[in-house]
Regions:
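Hydrophobic, aromatic-enriched alpha-helical segments typical of multi-pass transmembrane helices
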Residues: 1-219
Length: 219
C-alpha cells in the first residue's frame, strides 16, 4: 500500500516538474518592461515559439500526473463521506489548471509573435487589451482550484485524516504563501520571474515530498 502511495507522490512530483517547467519556459528572460502588465517583458517578447509549444505540451502530462497524486491523497481521509467530498472537489478543481495555463500562453505567444513579425509597436496595447478583457478568468479559475486545498486543511486540522493535526500547517497554500514572501526578498531577475510563475508547482513539490517522507518514516 505504502509503495503505491509513494509511486503516486512521485507521479505528482514529476507532474510538478512538467507543469512548473512549462511555467519557467514561458517566462524566463529579461524582466525589463514598458507597459502596465509586468510579465509582458523584453524577455517574453524574444522567447521563440517552440518554448511556448513545449510549455503547453508539458501541461497535459503534468495535469494527469498531478491528478494521480491528488486523488491518491484521499486514501488518507478516515471517513467515506469526507473522502467523497474531497474526491469531487479535486475533480472540479483540476480542469481550471489547464484553462489558466492556456490563458497566459495564448497572450504570451501573441506578444512574442507580434514583436518578431514587425508589429512590436502594437504588441503591448493589443496584448494588454486582451489581458484586460479576459482577466476575470484568473479569479474564477483560482476560485475553482483552491477549495480542495482549503478542505484538506480543514480535514487535517480537525483530525479527520490519518496525519497528525499539526500537519495541517504543511498545507500547499501555506507553503505557497511562504514562497511568495521569499520572492519579495529576491532581486529583480529572470530567475525571480520564472520562480514566481512556477510558484504553485514548486509549492506542490514540497507538499508531496513532506507527505511522502512522513509516511515513509511512520511505517
Amino acid at each position: 500500500m505504502q509503495s503505491k502511495q509513494n509511486a503516486a507522490f512521485l507521479c505528482g512530483i514529476l507532474g510538478c516538474l512538467c507543469y512548473g517547467g512549462g511555467d519557467w519556459l514561458m517566462m524566463y528572460g529579461s524582466t525589463a518592461h514598458s507597459g502596465a502588465v509586468s510579465w509582458l517583458t523584453e524577455g517574453t517578447a524574444s522567447i521563440p515559439g517552440w518554448r511556448y509549444d513545449l510549455a503547453m505540451a508539458l501541461a497535459f502530462p503534468g495535469i494527469i500526473l498531478y491528478g494521480i497524486a491528488l486523488f491518491s491523497v484521499q486514501s488518507y481521509i478516515k471517513n467515506e463521506k469526507e473522502r467523497k467530498i474531497y474526491h469531487y472537489l479535486n475533480a472540479f478543481g483540476l480542469t481550471p489548471w489547464i484553462a489558466l495555463h492556456l490563458f497566459y500562453i495564448m497572450i504570451l505567444t501573441l506578444f512574442s509573435w507580434m514583436n518578431g513579425t514587425g508589429y512590436a509597436a502594437q504588441a503591448i496595447p493589443v496584448c494588454e487589451g486582451l489581458y484586460s478583457q479576459l482577466s476575470w478568468l484568473i479569479p474564477v479559475t483560482e476560485g475553482m482550484m483552491l477549495p480542495v486545498f482549503i478542505y484538506w486543511f480543514y480535514l487535517q486540522i480537525s483530525g479527520k485524516t490519518i496525519f497528525p493535526k499539526w500537519m495541517a500547517f504543511t498545507n500547499v497554500l501555506l507553503i505557497f504563501g511562504a514562497l511568495k514572501c521569499l520572492t519579495l526578498l529576491m532581486p529583480d531577475s529572470a530567475f525571480r520571474l520564472g520562480f514566481t510563475n512556477g510558484l504553485m508547482s514548486e509549492s506542490m513539490v514540497i507538499w508531496f515530498a513532506i507527505m511522502m517522507i512522513y509516511r515513509s518514516k511512520s511505517k
